[in-house]
Every structure is written in structure tokens, then in C-alpha cells.
Amino acid sequence: MLFNSVLRQPQLGVLRNGWSSQYPLQSLLTGYQCSGNDEHTSYGETGVPVPPFGCTFSSAPNMEHVLAVANEEGFVRLYNTESQSFRKKCFKEWMAHWNAVFDLAWVPGELKLVTAAGDQTAKFWDVKAGELIGTCKGHQCSLKSVAFSKFEKAVFCTGGRDGNIMVWDTRCNKKDGFYRQVNQISGAHNTSDKQTPSKPKKKQNSKGLAPSVDFQQSVTVVLFQDENTLVSAGAVDGIIKVWDLRKNYTAYRQEPIASKSFLYPGSSTRKLGYSSLILDSTGSTLFANCTDDNIYMFNMTGLKTSPVAIFNGHQNSTFYVKSSLSPDDQFLVSGSSDEAAYIWKVSTPWQPPTVLLGHSQEVTSVCWCPSDFTKIATCSDDNTLKIWRLNRGLEEKPGGDKLSTVGWASQKKKESRPGLVTVTSSQSTPAKAPRAKCNPSNSSPSSAACAPSCAGDLPLPSNTPTFSIKTSPAKARSPINRRGSVSSVSPKPPSSFKMSIRNWVTRTPSSSPPITPPASETKIMSPRKALIPVSQKSSQAEACSESRNRVKRRLDSSCLESVKQKCVKSCNCVTELDGQVENLHLDLCCLAGNQEDLSKDSLGPTKSSKIEGAGTSISEPPSPISPYASESCGTLPLPLRPCGEGSEMVGKENSSPENKNWLLAMAAKRKAENPSPRSPSSQTPNSRRQSGKKLPSPVTITPSSMRKICTYFHRKSQEDFCGPEHSTEL
């Protein structure tokens, strides 16, 4: 009692800036505890535990310690919270509704209360006499909130899921045994999504008014600011509206217009609702508990509608989480969906709150005793009611054993922002360094460690980061510079449209060292002709012996790994495939084709498609202009012929001006041998090659030795083509 008298003393003094002189009580918040005697289980009709939905302390004189609790089964219980020593805490209970009671409110200064339930009614009870005074009927859905005016004991308001706000007056005569609303706000929180303007409807009598139903625009909480002002909030529109009750909203059923609105101030993309609204003792500050895990504080007397403070740290995922203020308006307590209750100091909302721990489910309704700072009541979905008291060290049994503690308070620590978290060097992941060597586990091909760094372009490996290195064009295209600057620069990010197979060729153990052309013969090529040898005849003699070994090279993955391990900076690895080697490779393919029957050679394109992977390891992928590059050049083993006149023939892919005469000579020879016209498609690629070089044993090509495409299909007998007369004559 001494503690309460000290707390009440500042309230009698002079206000400072709208606030009374206050004692530093924040250090006492961590002293709240809940003993085993202050934990009560909420039971239903059959004795099964059910969750309590609402709790509130009485405001009647000398009865401020009475706590009313309503649960899901429709029961209302009264608890005596004056002391822990009382054995019988619940001194009265009754079934108020045959449905869940979502909210209840005491009549100011009297032992009477009103309950709002899911049976679409609100009931007026005399607690002292234990009887029902009257039933308020008018809503068409569950009632979610009820509130009394501090200035009128007979006037209260209700809000329901039907989207309507109704004002009731118990002084009016009851009609057919039920109270009727004296004022109604229909569609109080409808969203403005209609494109057409609302049509004015004819005036109706308020007594016979049928309320509208809107299941999507539920009114979750209503509150009286004064005798003429009502505050409400909805479930989805995110707007807090202030209504002037001096206006008769039941006269015309139009879209109601509030006198003031507080728009949703949060950052959520969708508009959210509010689960609780409370006013301080002066009625000038509003605390709105939003479902975006924030509590917004608004100034009701100013013109600004933006919040003056924001409290966070808790979680609010349902419309059952409520809030309450301490008797001196210093502290704000709220339930939370994370099984705890939170207490903030109103003047310092940025400081971490004090947490009341002990519940095992969501904490829904909370109430700070208006006459005792040391007492807080909390309801939870774990079917229990807890009464928290300040621990003064006096709560002991006569035997000396302390009471069992089922709830305690702790100070929440400041949480570091995710963007400000500092990671130490030992925990951080090192950045990927540019890899100059190829990884044998890469799924896509990459250049070897000794491959030229800037000559040609390779496809990027799938797991290799991209790096950009600029080099001079002259150095990138000179064969001498390419071989000399292998280990000096890291690989350039290749582009797929400039890919060349030459840059993938590496040195095998049995290959001969590369022959460096004289400086006089080394030329700087243009970007478009970087892969075309300019002088072929001048380097044929030198490249003839070298090409015998180069033609056997393959780009096998195992070969790349073995060569890559042995490669050093000073190695003489072959980095390109000269044009003479490609010409010799075509000669070998033609020689192998000449040793087989010409009838079997016509199947060459079919066989070459099966070994296309081996063929592409030596020459470039075929272009649509040159069909010879896709021949069966990869058939191994092939006998090597001496470098002679046959090696002078070069392919069309090298674009040499002298290569145009052999095709004309072959066409003239064909016309001389075959006077009858032939289809161009009947000539096989091997026959085209034979006309451009001298063979050891020349083969005369006749129409009988060439197989047409029709010979591969089933040939019908003459009986199928001839009639019966012709068969008998034969």
C-alpha cells in the first residue's frame, strides 16, 4: 500500500509538458515474477482446458483487484488478485454465451460488465447480483470488440466482422427483450476499390435498419476518446479512423466519411490491420498495435497523422494480441506471438524492451492493473492466465521455502542490424583469385597452362570467373609473341564466335620441337584472316617433316592433364596447327579412301558422324560452305605417305587463290569421261579429291563403279514393273 501511495502522489502535482512528474521505475521491470499460485488454467464446460481471449481489471471503488477473464467456451470468471495467500482465487464463474467471448468491458465505476461474443450478441451483466440485465442484438457476424465511454456509464460501442460499428444506450427501452443500436456506421473500413461512385440511398428509419454485411472488411477494435468521438480500426484497410458521433450515420446509407484518418505508416507492400487500440489517461496519445510487428504512437490533438514513435521487438501475427498502459502512462505492455510479453518505456521507444517469459504459446490479451503498478495479467494460448508481481523478497511460505516460479522477466539485448554485422577475417570466405591454370574438373574446355594467353578465343568454363585483360593487337596475332608470353599474362576471357581449335593443341611427348619461321616470313595478320596462312608454298618444305608428327595429336582430357603437369614456362609447346598440317591431314583421308572400294566410300559421311569428336580434335569445325571438313578424317590408324605432290593440294577452307583451278580441271575431265549428264549429288567427296592429285594406281571412274543413292533402297524385280503379258513372253 505504501508503494501505491507513493506512485499516486505525483499524479496530484502539476503536469510538466503534458506528463506528470515520474519516478525512475524502469529498473524495477526486471523484478516481475509469476509464482505457481498466480498461474490459473482456463477450463471449458466439460473440464477441458481452453484458451482465454480477454482479461480486464475492474474500476469499481475498492474492487480494483477483481480481474474478469473470458475464454473460448463462453465462460466468464472473476479472480481476486489482491494477494497470493488467498486459496480461492476464482470466486465466481458463469457461462455468459454459448460461443466464444472475444472481448469484455467493465462499466466505469460499477460492478457491471458487457461481453461481446461470437453468437452475434453483446450481453449486459450485473456481476454483484449475478444476473443478466439485457442483450444487445443487431450484428450479423461475430463481435470482436466492445468499449465503454468514461463519461457515460450507459453508452458503449461494439465492432464486428460484418464491418459495422454500433453504438448502444442501455437507458433506452428494450424492444421485444433486446437492446437496439442508437447509431450505426456501416462499412466503416471498406476499401476504396470501387470505380463507380456510390449512389445515395433513400432515408430509412433507424429503428428498422438492417445492417450491411461485409465479411472482408472486419472491424477489429473500437474505442471511445470522449463522449462524442469514437476511434476504430479494421483488419485489412490499414487505416485508423476517428468518427464524430454527433453525426447520425444511420440517416443515409452511404459510404461513411470519418472526421480524421491515420493512414498506414509502415513499409509493408500490402495494407495491414490493427489488433489493439489504447489511449493514455489524457486521451491525447493513441497506441495502435499493428500486425506488421510494430506499435505506432499517434498524437490525437495535432494536425499531423504520422506516428511520433514506433515500438518494435515483439511479433504480432494474429488479431488477438492486445496492449495496455501502466497506471502512470510510463510503460507500455503488449502480448506477442513468440510466447512472451514485452514492456517498453514510452519516453524511450528505441531502447530494448523488458521481456516476460513463462508462457509456452502466443500471449494474447494483457492488462496492467490501473490501481496497482506491481500487477500485470497475461493470457496465453497455452490455456493459462498468469498474474505477474514485483518480487519484493516477501513471497515465502511459513516453512521458509520459496514459492515455485513459473514466470520471470529479463532485459532484451540490442540486436545488431543485419547490414552492420562485422565478420572477422577468420570467418570470412576468401575471394576467388584469378586462375591462370585450367582445372581438370571443369565441365567445359579451357586452355592449358602453357597455351597462348591471347591468341584465339576459347569457351569460358562454367565455374571460372570472368577477367578482362587487354593486350596490343600486334602481340596477340604474332606467332613469336604468342609463344614467348605464355606465363606473363593470365588468360583473356574468350568469346565463342572467335573460337579456334588451334589454341587447344598441346605438345605430346613424342612430338618434335616447333619450327619457328624466319622473321622475314612472319607477318601480322588482319583480324578476319588470323587463321589463314599467307605464304604456304614458302613454308611447305620446312613444315612437311613436322606435320607427320602433328597429325597424330589428339585433344584427349587425360592427355591435357598429363601435359599440363609437366609443362613449365620454358617449354616449347606447339600452340597452333599450321595450314600445311591441315592439308596433309586431308591427303591422308583421301589416301585411306582410295584403298577401299568406291562403293563403300559412299558411306563415308555416315561413318564420320559417329566419330565426329575425334575428327574435330585436329581441324576446325566445318563451315556450311566446305563439306570436306566433315569427312571421315578421324579414322585411325592411317598410313603416312611421303610428302610429295599430293601435299600441294590445299583445302577450300584455306582460301588460297591457286586452289580454284583443280575444280575446273576435275569438271572438264568428268565431261570427257562421262558424256551423259550426272547429278552433282552422285559425286562422292572422295571422288572430288582424287581429281586434284596424282595417285600411285589411278582408278578409272565409270558409271558402273559409282553407286547412286537409289541403290541403297530395295529394288523391285521386273515382274513388279511388267504386266502378265510381258512375264509370259520372257
UniProtKB/Swiss-Prot annotation:
Pathway the protein contributes to: Protein modification; protein ubiquitination
Single GO molecular function: protein-macromolecule adaptor activity
Motif Nuclear localization signal boundaries: 197-203
Domain of life: Eukaryota
Post-translational modification: Ubiquitinated by the anaphase promoting complex/cyclosome (APC/C). Autoubiquitinated through 'Lys-48'-polyubiquitin chains in a PCNA-independent reaction, allowing proteasomal turnover. Polyubiquitinated by SCF(FBXO11) when not phosphorylated, leading to its degradation. A tight regulation of the polyubiquitination by SCF(FBXO11) is involved in the control of different processes such as TGF-beta signaling, cell cycle progression and exit. Phosphorylated at Thr-464 by CDK1/Cyclin-B and CDK2/Cyclin-A but not by CDK2/Cyclin-E, MAPK1 or PLK1. Phosphorylation at Thr-464 inhibits the interaction with FBXO11 and decreases upon cell cycle exit induced by TGF-beta or serum starvation.
Major location (coarse): nucleus
Compositionally biased spans, kind Polar residues: 188-198, 679-689
InterPro entries reported in the protein's UniProt record: WD-repeat_CDT2_adapter, WD40/YVTN_repeat-like_dom_sf, WD40_repeat_CS, WD40_repeat_dom_sf, WD40_rpt
Phosphothreonine: residues carrying this PTM: T196, T464, T516, T684, T702
Effect seen on changing S468D: No effect on interaction with FBXO11
Record protein name field: Denticleless protein homolog
Organism: Homo sapiens (Human)
Lineage of producing organism: Eukaryota, Metazoa, Chordata, Craniata, Vertebrata
